[in-house]
Amino acid sequence: MADILTQLQTCLDQLATQFYATIGYLSTYHDNSPATTPTNIPNAAPALAKIPKNSTAPPVPAGAPVPSQSSPPPPQTQRGASEAAADPNLPPAPDSPRTFASRQRELARDLIIKEQQIEYLISVLPGIDSSEAEQEKRIRELEAELRGVEEEREAKIRELRTLGRTLERVMGAVETGIYGDRAVLERDS
């Protein structure tokens, strides 16, 4: 298992990916219906028909006379649903309001769950609720504990070497035989 900081970084990366995917879904599959204007505020947002569209003509200097507008290009013919689905350049059809709302709730729930995972990982980071002095004290305690464990390890290594030498003598005795040279065995012990 990875350490807490690695898990936290992974969760943050996943959260960023989820944000990107959520925004992508919402902008792709929304029906883009106009927002309803508040009834108590007249002209809160101008109707789209009143907003002039950007001109494709080159910019004209401020003092120059404005040329007359040519007739707008004829509207494009409506394409059939099968033709629109076959063209990869067209955006996909929006989801039904029910499906869109369901998926929107699911995406929001996923974002909340990931955010809660991140909060949990942050809460279990060491030192979150302790002062600098307490953290330094804890580090000194851990250093002392580490020294003790290291001394135990070195003692076990010495014991292992002693047992290894004893085992070599026993193996030598077996090699010499039970009734062989007992003087060698007595001398080594």
Swiss-Prot record:
Keywords of this entry: Activator, Coiled coil, Nucleus, Transcription, Transcription regulation
Compartments (UniProt record): Nucleus
Matching InterPro entries: Med7/Med21-like (IPR037212), Mediator_Med21 (IPR021384)
Feature: compositional bias, Pro residues: 58-76
GO terms, molecular function: transcription coregulator activity
Coiled-coil parts of chain: 127-170
Region (Disordered): 50-102
Pfam families given in the database record: Med21 (PF11221)
Entry annotated with the keyword Transcription regulation: yes
Main localization, broad class: nucleus
Sequence similarity: Belongs to the Mediator complex subunit 21 family.
Function: Component of the Mediator complex, a coactivator involved in the regulated transcription of nearly all RNA polymerase II-dependent genes. Mediator functions as a bridge to convey information from gene-specific regulatory proteins to the basal RNA polymerase II transcription machinery. Mediator is recruited to promoters by direct interactions with regulatory proteins and serves as a scaffold for the assembly of a functional preinitiation complex with RNA polymerase II and the general transcription factors.
Name this protein carries in UniProt: Mediator of RNA polymerase II transcription subunit 21
Name of the gene this protein is made from: srb7
